[in-house]
Each structure stands twice: as structure tokens, then as C-alpha cells.
């Protein structure tokens, strides 16, 4: 017989770190090339002109300019573009 009661561990006690997702630069704001516009899981926003798509679906500026959000196509696909300022 055991002299001590067996102590079970609870199955809680874990929490993941926040991922800080979302839009970082909003429409009409100026941006430099290389800066992050949107951090996302999957393509909620699709890259347009002047915008690149990272390995984790992060959208970033390829050129300096102003950020523009638009909705295109029959599926109402949201795209992000960077319009270079002259």
C-alpha cells in the first residue's frame, strides 16, 4: 500500500503567447518598402500592386507610397495595394 496519496496533475495551466495579428498600416497612410501592412493567418487580404506575400501570409510593401484597400471580383476579395507617390 502506498503511504502517500497519488497526486494527479491538472490538465490546465497552459496558455499560448499572443500573435499580434491584424492590419498594421491603414488605408491612406504612407508606408516605406519592406514595412508590414497586414499580419494574418491565411489570405483574408490578398496582395495587389506594390505588395508582397510572405511565407506566413504577411502582406508587406514592395515600394514606397500610400496604402489602398479595395474589394474586387464576384467573391468580394479584399486586396491591398501600395500606390507610389509621384
Curated annotation (Swiss-Prot):
- Keywords, sorted A to Z: Ribonucleoprotein, Ribosomal protein
Could you state one GO biological process linked to this protein?
translation
By its UniProt entry, which SUPFAM superfamilies does this protein fall under?
Ribosomal L27 protein-like
What are its GO cellular component terms? cytosolic large ribosomal subunit
Can you name one GO molecular function term for this protein?
structural constituent of ribosome
Q: Which InterPro entries is this protein grouped with? A: Ribosomal_bL27 (IPR001684), Ribosomal_bL27_CS (IPR018261)
Checking PROSITE patterns in the record gives: RIBOSOMAL_L27 (PS00831)
What is stated as this protein's family in its record? Belongs to the bacterial ribosomal protein bL27 family.
Name the UniProt record assigns to this protein: Large ribosomal subunit protein bL27
What species was this sequence derived from?
Xanthomonas euvesicatoria pv. vesicatoria (strain 85-10)
Amino acid at each position: 500500500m502506498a503511504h502517500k496519496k497519488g497526486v494527479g496533475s491538472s490538465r490546465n495551466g497552459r496558455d499560448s503567447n499572443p500573435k499580434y495579428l491584424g492590419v498594421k498600416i491603414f488605408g491612406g497612410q504612407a508606408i516605406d518598402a519592406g514595412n508590414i501592412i497586414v499580419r494574418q493567418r491565411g489570405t483574408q487580404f490578398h496582395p495587389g500592386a506594390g505588395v508582397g506575400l510572405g511565407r506566413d501570409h504577411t502582406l508587406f510593401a514592395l515600394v514606397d507610397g500610400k496604402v489602398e484597400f479595395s474589394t474586387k471580383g464576384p467573391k468580394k476579395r479584399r486586396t491591398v495595394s501600395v500606390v507610389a507617390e509621384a
